[in-house]
């Protein structure tokens, strides 16, 4: 118990001294994750006005907030999460479990027949702390996100997803390379150094898989 307490204290100390946490508080952003996305978007110039953007695993809303900030009042931002999220101006949000067919169908109905320019996925399972459990759960969510992009992302569009390095990672990246002209692995500055997370970016969705 004492170890857990020390671990919690260390996390709290790191969290409140984190420059990205302070920046988020100062700028009214919902999470420090907004700055991971900001770096990724700017580096690869992924956003343009009038785009249709889907944000999977959106809560508490930092990514959707960042997208809306960059594209202004143009385009559409559609967000989904198993956790509820307070409303954000200009963001269409669905509260539900992406793994459930009924929720996915409802989200697709919100989207209509509109092709998507950019699919973002920051989804992650609740961590058990056991890698042999967490990694397969993470990869399952990643497969669902890839399927969604297959079905709704327009030819030439981009797909950005959070992944944990571990079993299944290399195979997943290979699958992305069959679908996109260019695939890059990114570790933004706002990602904590000890975190296994990286972001895989697929650009130039192909009309047909290789």
UniProtKB/Swiss-Prot annotation:
S-adenosyl-L-methionine binds at residues 61, 63, 81, 97, 122. This is Ribosomal RNA large subunit methyltransferase E. Residues 187-196 have a biased composition (Basic and acidic residues). GO terms for cellular component: cytoplasm. Gene3D superfamilies: Vaccinia Virus protein VP39 (3.40.50.150). Specifically methylates the uridine in position 2552 of 23S rRNA at the 2'-O position of the ribose in the fully assembled 50S ribosomal subunit. The active site is at residue 162. It catalyses: uridine(2552) in 23S rRNA + S-adenosyl-L-methionine = 2'-O-methyluridine(2552) in 23S rRNA + S-adenosyl-L-homocysteine + H(+). Its EC number is 2.1.1.166. InterPro entries: RNA_methyltr_RlmE, RNA_MeTrfase_FtsJ_dom, rRNA-MeTfrase_E, SAM-dependent_MTases_sf. The keyword Hydrolase does not apply. It is found in: Cytoplasm. NCBIfam families: PRK11188.1 (NF008390). GO terms for molecular function: rRNA (uridine-2'-O-)-methyltransferase activity. Pfam families: FtsJ (PF01728). Keywords: Cytoplasm, Methyltransferase, rRNA processing, S-adenosyl-L-methionine, Transferase. It comes from Stenotrophomonas maltophilia (strain K279a).
């Amino acid at each position: 118990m004492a170890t857990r307490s020390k671990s919690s204290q260390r996390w709290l100390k790191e969290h409140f001294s984190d420059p990205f946490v302070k920046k988020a508080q100062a700028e009214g952003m919902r999470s420090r994750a907004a700055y991971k996305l900001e770096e990724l978007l700017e580096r690869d110039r992924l956003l343009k006005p009038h785009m249709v953007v889907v944000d999977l695993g959106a809560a508490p809303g930092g990514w959707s907030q960042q997208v809306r900030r960059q594209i202004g009042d143009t385009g559409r931002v559609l967000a989904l999460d198993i956790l509820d999220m307070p409303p954000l101006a200009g963001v269409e949000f669905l509260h539900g479990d992406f793994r459930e067919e009924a929720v996915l169908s409802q989200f697709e109905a919100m989207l209509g027949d509109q092709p998507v320019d950019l699919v973002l996925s920051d989804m992650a399972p609740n961590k058990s702390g056991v890698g042999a459990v967490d990694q397969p759960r993470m990869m399952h969510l990643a497969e669902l996100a890839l399927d969604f992009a297959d079905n709704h992302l327009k030819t030439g569009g981009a797909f950005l997803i959070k992944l944990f390095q571990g079993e299944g990672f290399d195979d997943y990246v290979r699958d992305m390379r069959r679908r996109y002209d260019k695939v890059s692995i990114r570790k933004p500055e706002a990602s904590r150094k000890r975190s296994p997370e990286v972001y895989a970016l697929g650009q130039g969705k192909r009309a047909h898989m290789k």
